[in-house]
Amino acid sequence: MKFSVLVLLASYLVGVNSSIVDTSEELICPDPENPLDCYPKLFVPTNEWQTIKPGQDIPPGLHVRLNIDTLEKEAKLMSADEKDEPVQEVVVGGELQDHSREAITENLQKLHESKHPEVKQEHAHRTKVSQGDLSNFDAACSEIESFKPHESDVERLHLALDTLEELSHDIEFGVKLTSDKAIFQSLVNIANGASDPKITEKVYRVMGSSLRNNPEAISNILTNFDKSYVDNLFEQLANENDVLQKRILGIIQALVQNSHFVRQYFSFDHSSGLNDLIAIFPKLGPNSKSRASNILEDLQLFPVTNDRRSLEDQDPESQVSKFIQNSFVGNKLDEKNFKSYFDQLVNLHQSNKSLRPSGDFLNWLAEEVESRKENKKRDDYSQEDKDFDEYMLRARHEVFGNPMGLRKAIADEL
């Protein structure tokens, strides 16, 4: 949730025993092929706020905050008079006391309710639920983990999810939530079994918020869970409404920020996630289609074109169509995915007549159709192959080109 103010939720103190790192030797290079895009492993503080980059070690005794607008952690040197100044961040200058964590939670709840009165009103209606014992992270997690369908108090579940959704925007709470496999698995179970879509949406919001721009939290999920977690997300996509689809895709979009996850699920060499996203796209709602096209854009599997037409055309269906076309033009698809991707592209253009094929794709399609004529000479040329070759020929003219050209093409075949 985006606030207009900066709120520090840094409820921890960096350990005083952190090792000193030689910055001349210890560098972090996100892109091994770009040595200029490196930064020191040890964060070097100044008197000005600086963003703490992924993987950096932080020296002890700094003033640390979370920028809620950018969801980035920042730090600077602690000034002598800073403790007496009325600031909008909570400064952690020593060991964290229990009441400090409670104060952070309480202030965060008040800030949220002041900006969203409907939340405060909704909570007021739940008179039978004690809010005090579910307003902190540990109590909310305990309620989630012990929840039993048809037995536990659903109103208490709502309160616990509200607390976690609020706190999960903070990077440290996101890390803490994802580091406990039992709690996160409980969230998965609740989402899969809930009959109330409001509960399901809250669960997905908690998951998405805890992972967004939080590399350590993402790493926790990738370590603690197996492929079934990702498979389950895509399975739920087909059965949910647009709101829930968008929430689920928000989780997937957070995960694709991890290069290891992308290589395993969203590369052309390991394309199970990519294939699922393309296959499910026609079943998505309008908002979810936008989120799906954003995921494809985030992957950066193809060079970004800055021509005027590309910049002006941001329609999700057009973006997905271009992605599939580029997959063919770039010869990225293996034999297993070739037919399914082509079928998806044909269906997409048949359902949306405003979509236009690119010149590069039309040239590729013409060459592909011509080259497939040689298949007839093969001894192992099956009826299935023949049917698909004819399907491509018809699609070339009826879907992507001039339908009248099909007559001439068939005549040439004869």
UniProtKB/Swiss-Prot annotation:
This chain belongs to which protein, by name? Nucleotide exchange factor SIL1
Q: Which GO terms describe its cellular component?
A: endoplasmic reticulum; endoplasmic reticulum lumen
**Record's function text:** Required for protein translocation and folding in the endoplasmic reticulum (ER). Functions as a nucleotide exchange factor for the ER lumenal chaperone KAR2.
Ordered alphabetically, the record's keywords are:
Endoplasmic reticulum, Glycoprotein, Protein transport, Signal, Translocation, Transport
Known partners and oligomeric status: Interacts with KAR2.
Where are the membrane-spanning stretches? Answer: none
Signal sequence, renumbered to the chain: 1-18
Q: Does the keyword Protein transport apply?
A: yes
Q: Write down a Pfam family by its short name.
A: SIL1
Q: Where found?
A: Endoplasmic reticulum lumen
Q: What stretch of residues is annotated with the motif Prevents secretion from ER?
A: 411-414
Residues modified by carbohydrate are N17, N352
Return the Gene3D superfamilies for the record: Leucine-rich Repeat Variant (1.25.10.10)
Task: Cite a single GO BP annotation.
Answer: protein transport
